């Protein structure tokens, strides 16, 4: 019985950690993409450097940064806090809206 309770508790902690990591990854990707979009006029290198700086400040890893015209797409990865197994990834796009 104790083993079952410990297994359920460990599983719940891991699931909770995964949800938190996913939300952290999306928030960091959104903020990094907005920061990069604000610097896109200075060039793609400057924009991606700004995205990396924001990611470092939020203690997450930048997987990718792509600039296409005025659009910036940033991909972020966050390691799970519990167990250290796996990670959560999220991507965000920032730039002007496209009008038809």
Regions found by a protein language model. Give the residues of each.
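Short amphipathic secondary-structure patches
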Residues: 34-80, 96
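Low-complexity, S/T/G/P-rich flexible repeat/linker segments used as non-globular hinges
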Residues: 82-100
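Alpha-helical assembly-interface signal, strongest on the long, hydrophobic N-terminal helix that forms
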Residues: 1-47
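A general, composition-driven signal for non-globular sequence regions
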Residues: 16-20, 73, 87
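Alpha-helical scaffold segments in soluble metabolic enzymes
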Residues: 31, 50, 91
